[in-house]
Amino acid sequence: MTKAVFHPDYPAFLAALKERILHARTTAARAVNRELALLYWDIGRAIVEKQQLLGWGESVIDRLSADLLGAFPHMSGFSPRNMRDMKRFYLAYSDESIWRQPVAKLSKSLSSDLNQNWRQVVAKLDQSPATTDFLRQLLAQIPWGQHLLILNKLTDPTARLYYLRATAQLG
């Protein structure tokens, strides 16, 4: 069997294609994570709103889980536990007043370089009704597993915001 002889540029060409493929995979994974975070926020919001509006109890989560798993048998993420986490995710970050004070408090304790970034965050938060959109965009930058870690380990909104920002900036 003879080995084909390729142009000397072939290794560089192959390396460039591999890099492009890896970049596309990373970009796609980020897009999926972003959409999942937004979906889970929306599901959590919808559950909370229906429970408040119609007086539904916690058992609706078990029913929703069973129905969604039946409708989407090849998809994961709709277990009762995960759906309760979606509700908790929404409740943890939905109250705008929770974010104004911690952001302002945290910005006072940061170095001057970081303080400028936090002032921008505070300014954005003070431009309600854009606050919810701003928070949604911040939350969408972070994979679901990271959100669960933050929710499970931290209860203080200031600490949560710090770790959300750090995760969004540093990955």
Regions picked out by a protein language model, each given a short descriptive name:
Residues 1-171:
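Basic, low-complexity intrinsically disordered segments
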